[in-house]
Amino acid sequence: MFLIQCLISAVIFYIQVTNALIFKGDHVSLQVNSSLTSILIPMQNDNYTEIKGQLVFIGEQLPTGTNYSGTLELLYADTVAFCFRSVQVIRYDGCPRIRTSAFISCRYKHSWHYGNSTDRISTEPDAGVMLKITKPGINDAGVYVLLVRLDHSRSTDGFILGVNVYTAGSHHNIHGVIYTSPSLQNGYSTRALFQQARLCDLPATPKGSGTSLFQHMLDLRAGKSLEDNPWLHEDVVTTETKSVVKEGIENHVYPTDMSTLPEKSLNDPPENLLIIIPIVASVMILTAMVIVIVISVKRRRIKKHPIYRPNTKTRRGIQNATPESDVMLEAAIAQLATIREESPPHSVVNPFVK
């Protein structure tokens, strides 16, 4: 059963990534159609831009348990100073292992934005949106880093997304506008960006906080409570029992309290068995019913059309008659005649006749 599941996952994954870019991390990978988007402002039609994709598991990255949890953090570095600014943090808990997709149909989702950031910029991997910018401006150009940390892993995977913003200049080309690009974005690795950010000025550590903002960005501990972080404010999109979001379908959200998150016991039966066992039992019951019906129909047809079998014993007795039996019969008849001759019938005396 496990081999069949792996084969199906591989086929589905191959179909999904045929026309996509894959950035493989240590514990999870990123699948996007493009890691860079360009915006022309002012925008004519749509009032937002986004990079679509999803987080996936490749090969040995697939979690071994039935459920997993993790934390995502979206960072932003502008194209001038390359100072990191944490934008959003998302916490996923109770995520089932469904094929190769990561963080879909999770039982709990909790999202926060930093106080010094804007809600216009966000990420929602469970909805297939890796980066979304509403009402983009020239200051939104730069490099965005998505940090992903699974609870069962010891390191954080980082994926880079780029945004170019162009403005209409005073000179016009044949189409009526000329595009002016901000500073060029060369290929920056996650490690290089981190090293650059260490030289930037960081905000002062709030009172009562044991770590700085930058240390918090680089140290995403799975067991660390994000609700008490002084830089975070909770988003409205915090949900419970969140299902897979599809484009064009309105999703309802419900607030939840992560303190009431139940712990999963190791003795609990796997969720796959809870699905497979009823299916197998139903198939066996249906098969047994079909067999019983077939046997009943066959018996009824046999009773309606019985097979005639002659009594061969009587015929054999008649055919096997020998001349000896005829001789004995004749002797008995002769003896009976002799007895009648020797003993004539008695005369009947009528008492009324003298």
UniProtKB/Swiss-Prot annotation:
Keywords: Glycoprotein, Host cell junction, Host cell membrane, Host Golgi apparatus, Host membrane, Host-virus interaction, Membrane, Phosphoprotein, Signal, Transmembrane, Transmembrane helix, Viral envelope protein, Viral immunoevasion, Virion
Iron in keyword set: no
InterPro entries hit by this protein: Herpes_gI
Resulting phenotype, residue 344 to A: Marked decrease in phosphorylation
Predominant localisation class: virion
Residue ranges annotated as Intravirion topological domain: 313-354
GO cellular component, one term: host cell junction
Membrane spanning stretches: 296-312
Subunit and partners: Interacts with gE; this interaction enhances the Fc receptor function of gE.
Protein family: Belongs to the alphaherpesvirinae glycoprotein I family.
Protein name: Envelope glycoprotein I
Gene: gI
